């Protein structure tokens, strides 16, 4: 199942993501990353190979979360204590090495969290 946050504006190849998800052994959750964009906050991803070791809003890395992820709800319900908070879910998945990051990145990606972001959006998606 794909999950996208409502503030995402993107051009992404879902077939490539699906292929990557199966190549990685169908983890419980796989996050789709992007290169950081100046002026946009995000959860920076720290990983070994494609297994996420940690996420940070303060310490920067070369990629961060887009808000796009592939989830397997059955595996989540079978292996993870119930929560309504994605940050808690991610921490629990990190603990059992089931939070992966994809090798596939969107061709274009942006998030619109405020009016300034909306104004910049037109420049990016011409």
For the regions a language model picked out, list residue spans one by one.
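Glycine-rich, N-terminal phosphate-binding loop of Rossmann-like dinucleotide-binding domains
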Residues: 12-13, 33
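Catalytic-core segments of class I nucleotidyltransferases/pyrophosphorylases
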Residues: 1-2, 9, 18-22, 35-37, ...
